[in-house]
Every structure is written in C-alpha cells, then in structure tokens.
C-alpha cells in the first residue's frame, strides 16, 4: 500500500494540556482510546497527525501475538514500513506502564519510533522503559482481543476535548 511519506516528524500541532481521543474502526469492531499528551506529547502529536492525514486507514494489523499484543501502523505490512522519519522515545518521566489495554509505540530499538504501534492484551512489564506508552483503551478491549493477523483498520478518527 502506497502511503504519503515525510522527511521529518510533524511539528507540534496538539495542545498537551488538552485531552485527545481516537476511534479506531476495524473489520472486527471499534476501539476507543484516550491519549495522555502530558506524558508523551511528541508521540500523541505524531499519532494524531498521521491519523488526520489518513495514514492508518486501510492498513492491516501485521503482527498479532496471542496474550501479548496486536501491532499495526505499517503501510507495507512487513513490519519494516513507516512514514519515512523517526523520532525519540518518551519514556523518561512517563509514569504510564504496559498494563492491559495500553497503546504504545513499536520500534526497532531506542529512538526509532515512526508510525507503528501496538495495543496490549495483558500486562507486559518487560517493555516498560523500552517503548513509549501514550494512551489507554477506554472501550473495545474485546475487539483488540478478537483481532487476528491481517485484520484491517478501516478508519481512525481523532477527537479533542
């Protein structure tokens, strides 16, 4: 799938003092997420930017590991694709941990975040400090648990409150 690419991460477009929510519509149902920009402003800004650009629409969950997580955000579906830029982790001073139903950035090592994210099925404390947690599922954990490899994201919508 050909998606737009950028040479740099997006400029800050969100207000970290506001609350942001995403609705991820998939072929298995809807997942509602609340983001925490006060702990991971660059990461939330990045997800909001990509969602508003339609980057995630039509992309599959290319990696699903039972009782662990679902991973999406790669337009190539190989686990190697992204928006053509990388940005740093936001784990220092971030009190959010890898509990059940959190959304976190997938990466290929420190400071290699792009567009790929994962949502946990269960607590994954071994990932704390290695991946930026930036939100929590508020509705649809049953959908997360039902998603299988190859299921697709239909649309991601962002709301600000």
Regions flagged by a language model, labelled:
Residues 1-161:
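Cyclophilin-like peptidyl-prolyl cis-trans isomerases
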């Amino acid at each position: 799938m050909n998606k737009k690419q950028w040479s740099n991460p997006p400029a800050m477009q969100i207000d970290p003092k506001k609350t942001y929510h995403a609705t991820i519509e998939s072929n298995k149902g809807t997942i509602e997420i609340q983001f925490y920009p006060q702990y991971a402003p660059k990461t939330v800004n990045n997800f909001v930017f990509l969602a508003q650009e339609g980057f995630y629409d039509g992309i599959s969950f290319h990696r699903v590991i039972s009782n662990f997580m679902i991973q999406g955000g790669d337009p190539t579906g190989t686990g190697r694709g992204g928006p053509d830029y990388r940005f740093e982790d936001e784990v220092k001073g971030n009190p959010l941990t890898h509990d059940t139903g959190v959304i976190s950035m997938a990466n290929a090592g420190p400071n290699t975040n792009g567009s790929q994210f994962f949502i946990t099925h269960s607590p994954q404390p071994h990932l704390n400090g290695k991946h930026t947690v930036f939100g929590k599922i508020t509705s649809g954990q049953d959908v997360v648990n039902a998603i299988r490899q190859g299921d697709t994201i239909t649309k991601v919508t962002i709301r600000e409150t």
